[in-house]
């Protein structure tokens, strides 16, 4: 049947028109869908980037609060309020705070971003060799200018600043290079510390290099490893159960274990060298190669060991001593004082190994250094970093950093920071002493255009209202209390205007300027100013003759004028595609992804010199900063092109100001105050420059063109198009009539959703293609008129009129070009699809970076809450001391310690612990500051409380029967250990399904289970078992497409994993979880895994 239908249709002479119209319509629908999807993805990517940078800003402030708590410069009773304010902060468009200074501040930040050497010079001049002051300066640059190094280009810029700053100060130190690095008070060493502690690639490298070795030390348990022989002997002899005659044997055991641990650390560090971040590798290598030729022989030796210190003493050893701080191990892992001591001893030995070529080690270390087998690995590692050929990634970094190659690294398109950050940055730059460096002088000159400080929204409200509102007064009272909590002199880390106020006073989004496109020659700037003045003078003339403008050009000018000057009545401003509502839009990167075809008209217009995007009064030198750079050439901000043509905003304050100006009030609107000096700031810019800065770029070009046509016809160049005939049969495909007809047919046929049915065909005479096309269009026209679609009907009549100009051969050529246009449209659709795929990948990358930021923030939150709870349990709330001088919390914890050991029944112990935790939670929440804590902070606080309380009574709770329980655990571990060497996944007693053997021996699950004994609380131990089972479940899913692990699959594999991992004290761990977490595993996933795990252990008992 289908063949018969196809045969009939093949003889239809109208078929070509039907198929062509259908294809054009399909292409139009597909192109519209792709365009809408592309626009949506661009907006989503822009919103995701702002969200990402805001989260990074919050995380940076959280880190600083944690640092101040640790240094005791912040009162713990105000910490939760600060964290709550930071967490509730949302970023707003910066121009709302800074007014007409926005573009200048934007220019300043972009110059600082593009000139890392100038930033290093500035930091070097500001260095006060004070840790607190330097850290505040570094943090401002770190999260405001470089966005915490999230994007690859940001990370490289930070690396360049660190490298150049270290070179400046190392050269100045001469033979004291290593001393400067070890003191860690100079701004270069502080910035390097920030770099290695905050950069995600560095944390990944440290995890790879140290995690296994650190876990081995943790699993050693409560065994002291002392380098000092006297201290080791003292610990041994203090135990009354030990015999002094066994002291040499004990000392040999200590030395043997320390040597084995050190060798294991060095081996893993060497194996992880390939994971060393390229930027860090480049910093050390560039410092060595740059300074080696300019220093004397003694300083060259000092330089070599200084570079070694940068890796070993300033990176590896701190991470070994504090593995949880660097994310090497989880914060839930039990690391007590003994483990901390042992890790410190190992780090000291490794440091001595790295220094032994330069200085003689102390006597107590020589015994260990002589027995270590892998001492050569450090020297080999440094030779690989400094002397051998660079890795490809390091070589690329070197080329980009030296300016020999353009950067193709992904970068951001916004700056996010607080008002305090901007004020601090401006203050420091304005106070920079005079210098002969032209770049720094230009940066200072840009900064001089702005006021000394900007006022916050709270201060602006205070200016507008003569009487303080009760709410505002309460905010200031809270602020005064918080400021008293900072126990240091100088500027507070938090600006007085940003604490305890509404969230709009925190975040600001600055769009990165593209200096390659926007900073042009001063002559071009002056020419644009003259054009603007001419347009103003001729405004009346254009209005008088507007009605006489031809229909081809008038709608463009009128539409732009109406769009620019129309009042805003509601919040539906963004529905107009020609306008952007900056109350909801931060930045839209229109050209983040470049299409390989020719740029659109809009893109070409943006690439022209644009005076409206920069300050008109900027000096020539400032306008030429970064002109030779191309790093931001891809950051063409859509909002930069559109915002200058918008003179209104739908915010309440802007509408109020517009009403005041329109009513000609003599008083200047107070809502426009944007600096600390209020209305007394002298405006150094002329009126024309301010108008030119915010004028619409597109409107200027349109008005200029229109006026030229209307008034200055003599000066116009001869129009070659008008001199040629509209329709030319001799030059058919190049004449304007052919191009117009082709364009109109594509437009009309692309909008037709229904095609006529021509049922009667005349066979009396042969019809030409032109006649058939006219008949086909008549059918479409009739259908359109019947549907009352008069606009489309008018377009169809225009198409029919244009076709009348052509002969039959011309119509056939026109049809051929329509078919050829199909190929071009397919190519454009493919380009849009490729661009959409790139945007989707970028969106995925941003989501990945956000997860990374949230992970770091969660680690910071855990460390911070742990410090707060430890203070709470050790000292309590100082304002609630009892007559004994102790707080109720301290008394309750002491009572728990003294009575817990007398309880024998498991239920009594569990209930006693739960009662204490309930009481401590109630006491904690009675503190006003903890009412501001988030749910995650409270949950972490309860976990920390339980861990802190149980740590002191852990052995009593874990082995209630002491020696009897320990013997059972050792016996089971011994039996499992013997079986472990002979058991394989195909052992007949295990009965593991054959389709699961491809993932054997499940090493990830074994590694997770081996951590069981390193946790303190029952819930943490249960979580460890759940993660082990989850790993097995995920591996089972790899065995087949739709594999879901049932109990029959999970239990045999779990038996094999338990035998191979052979965790310590397995029976006591199960009993401990049953006692103190039994009520929490009644149902759900945890209960399912818990039952399967106990079944696996019971089965092991039967088969061994």
UniProtKB/Swiss-Prot annotation:
Question: Which keywords are on file for this protein?
Answer: Cytoplasmic vesicle, Endocytosis, GTPase activation, Guanine-nucleotide releasing factor, Membrane
Keyword Plastid in annotation: no
Query: Major location, coarse class?
Result: membrane
Q: Does the keyword Membrane apply?
A: yes
Report the residue ranges that make up the Ras-GAP domain in this protein: 156-389
Query: Residue ranges of region Disordered?
Result: 663-682
Q: Where in the cell is it found?
A: Membrane; Cytoplasmic vesicle, Clathrin-coated vesicle
Q: Where is the VPS9 domain?
A: 966-1104
Q: Example GO molecular function term? A: small GTPase binding
Gene Ontology terms: biological process? endocytosis; regulation of protein transport
PROSITE patterns referenced in this protein's UniProt entry, alphabetically: RAS_GTPASE_ACTIV_2, VPS9
Q: What does this protein do?
A: Acts both as a GTPase-activating protein (GAP) and a guanine nucleotide exchange factor (GEF), and participates in endocytosis. Acts by regulating the activation of rab-5 by exchanging bound GDP for free GTP at clathrin coated pits.
Q: What is the protein's quaternary organization?
A: Interacts with GDP-bound rab-5. Interacts with alpha-adaptin.
Name of the featured protein = Receptor-mediated endocytosis protein 6
